Amino acid sequence: MRTAEESSGTVLHRLIQEQLRYGNPTDPTLLAIQQQALRGGSSGGGAGSPRSSLESLTQEESLSPQLSARQEPQGQEHQGDFQHSESPVCHLYQLHTEELPTYEEAKAHSQYLAYQRGQIGLHQGSLESPGGVGGAEQDDSMWDAKREHARSLSERLLQLSLERNCAHDNIPMSSSHSYPQLSNNHSDTVVNEQSVHQPDQRGPPPEYPFMVRSPGYMLSHSQEHGHYYNEPPPAFHSQHYRLFPTQPQAPRHNGLPTLTPAGQDVNVGGYSIPANNFQMEQLIKENERLKREVDSYSEKAARLQKLEQEIQRISEAYETLMKGSAKREALEKTMRNKLESEIKRLHDFNRDLRDRLETANKQRAAIEVEDKSRHAFAKLVEQNEDHLRERERLEKETQHLRASGEEWKRRREALEQALITAQTRNRQLEEELRRKRAYVEKVERMQSALAQLQAACEKREALELRLRTRLEQELKSLRAQQWQAQTQHASPGSYLDLNVSSLQQQLREREEQVLALEADITRWEQKYLEESTMRQFAMDAAATAAAQRDTTIINHSPRNSPNSSFNEDLPSPNHRHQEMENRIRALYAQLLEKDAIIKVMQQRSRREQGRPELQGLRPARSVPSINTVATASTTRAKGKSLSDDQTAVASLPPLPHLLAKIQCRDSSTQCDSEEPSCKAEPADVAVSAPEPSTASSSESTSLKTTQISSAVENDMVEILI
């Protein structure tokens, strides 16, 4: 398992690097171990066989005890300090047939040893004085505990291995035969501590025959190992486990000399020593301390040997796993070969099946072709019989079509004759249309001349209106001046002169009124002529449309001809042409009628808009009335035929009667102080004598006149609608 070996070598190399970093970097022993690890990693890098991560994980889970779930940093914080921190030194222990312990085992073992060291320090502190050697060792253990909390677990593992090597100070090589040089490091540390506590350097203490150990205390190295290996290994992660020395070791810890007052002896190990020998007491204390250290190192060595046995067992399990992996790979290779042979066999079988399928498809296609040819022959026989029957039917239809062709030929000749007749009628209608167009153009010219005449008349009327208005204003001003003058110069004796002057004034007013009425008569006669001309034009247009309509009805009436039944079946294009022409003529006549109505309405609106300032003197109430009557007569003439137009004209009231009514209204609106009574006669117009009235009567009369004129206008508008 190359990955596990590389990780083990990486852990060992980290231990060495951290020891060099936190310990003595110039130690030649550590440098030699590092170089040996590098050489061993480069020489044994190709050993081992790969295994899957699942197998290695399963093997490690089955061999490692249940440990705590907390993961300590494995020295990654020091990976960037050295370039060769990840060098391949994974086979360093493999050269000596050993492997490093796993991370969980090393962690549990370090926790156990730290707890054991703390218990030993506390026990020594209770036996010795506070200022003696035990206090110094307790301080050392406390400093080690702080350092373990500050450093990583890999540094603790390296310290553990160094302490194991220091336990055998007289043996040049440890039990693992891996790194004998590491034992000098901790021995130097012990010598330094002894030099601190004991300044003078002396040789080894002499042998004292009177200080003999008890038989229970003198245990050989193999017996101590046997005592540890006969027991089951303790749970390293348990917090309730406490390690106490065995019962035969109790006299060793309790054999310290008991100090007595001066002049008495000291009992040590069952022997009496003079109390005044100070050097002897120091040697006894040093001997006891060294014994305790040897015992602690022996225990540590036993623990390390048990850890090495556990590592050996793990390596054996790993070898077993590698063998199983090799067997599994061989089995997989065998199965792969079998599967490849099976795939080849299936390919051959598939090829045979494909060939058989192609042969079957070809046979089936041949059978289908034969069946199709048989069905096609049967269908051809049936089609031949159908064709024979169809041929007989077509021969009968051919004979029938020949007879109908002769009939169609006769009809064509009749249609040609009808076409010639229609063309002749079309030429006649075109000539008539040209004549009517010339007549329409003549009417349009007359209408334009009439419009010019009306414009000239309107200009003249406007001029006369302005002149009359100015003269009336001057007359009013002169009359007012004359009346004021007469009022100022009037006296009670001149009543007759005033009456004569008033009569003369009334006479002049009546003469002016007569002149105004004569001017109105002349103007209304002119307007009547214009309206009659417009009505005549409308009547002519309506008569033309009615005559054309009558002609169309006569031409399209049914005739008793030999080909009448045939003509009814076939619609003639000439008939459509004639209908379109008639429709065009009717629309043109309606257009002319509407033009005439529009012109009359425009004239009336212009007259109404041109005379707003004369409303007080003489409101033009008669103009809309005449225009409305003329428009109504024109509308009636346009909407009916020629006979209807004549009837409508006869039904209208006589023109002199209308003029009399209009003149009466005009005369009643011209004078503010008089109320004339107009009587319309067929031949003449009589004007009654005026009577003086008040302003209220004149206003009521004007209101009545306005209401009557508005009612007449409403009636005319309803007639037009």
UniProtKB/Swiss-Prot annotation:
Q: How is it modified after translation?
A: Phosphorylation at Tyr-103 is necessary for efficient binding to SRC and synergistically functioning with SRC to activate the downstream MAPK pathway.
Indicate the principal place this protein occupies in or around the cell: other
The UniProt record describes its induction as: Up-regulated by fgf17 and fgf8.
User: What subcellular compartments does it reside in?
Assistant: Recycling endosome; Cytoplasm; Cell projection, Podosome; Cell junction
Ranges annotated as biased composition (Polar residues): 172-198, 554-567
Per UniProt, what is one Pfam family of this protein?
A: Angiomotin_C
Q: Which domain of life is it from?
A: Eukaryota
One GO CC term on file: plasma membrane
User: What is the tissue localization of expression for this protein?
Assistant: Expressed in endothelial cells.
The reply to whether Coiled coil figures as a keyword in the UniProt entry is yes
Q: What is the effect of changing Y103F?
A: Loss of phosphorylation. Drastic reduction in SRC-binding and in activation of MAPK
- Keywords, ordered alphabetically: Cell junction, Cell projection, Coiled coil, Cytoplasm, Endosome, Phosphoprotein, Wnt signaling pathway
Q: What effect does gene inactivation have here?
A: Morpholino knockdowns show pericardial edema with accumulation of erythrocytes at 28 hpf with no circulating cells present in the trunk vasculature at 48 hpf. Constrictions and lumen narrowing in the dorsal aorta, these defects are not seen in the posterior cardinal vein at 48 hpf. Morpholino amotl2a and amotl2b double knockdowns show significant defects in endothelial cell anteroposterior elongation at 30 hpf. Disrupted organization of radial actin fibers that connect perpendicularly to endothelial junctions at 48 hpf. Pericardial edema is evident at 48 hpf.
What start-end ranges are recorded for coiled-coil regions in this protein?
A: 275-531
Q: Where is this region: Disordered?
A: 35-84, 169-214, 554-575, 666-709
Q: Which GO terms describe its biological process?
A: actin cytoskeleton organization; angiogenesis; cell migration; convergent extension; cortical actin cytoskeleton organization; dorsal aorta development; dorsal aorta morphogenesis; embryonic pattern specification
The entry's family comment says: Belongs to the angiomotin family.
Q: What role is this protein assigned?
A: Required for proper architecture of actin filaments and for cell movements during embryogenesis. Plays a role in the radial actin fiber architecture in skin epithelial cells, thereby maintains cell geometry, size and cell interconnectivity within the skin. Plays an important role in coupling actin fibers to cell junctions in endothelial cells and is therefore required for correct endothelial cell morphology and maintenance of dorsal aorta lumen expansion during embryogenesis.
Under what name is this protein listed?
Answer: Angiomotin-like 2a
| Naturally occurring in which organism (per UniProt) | Danio rerio
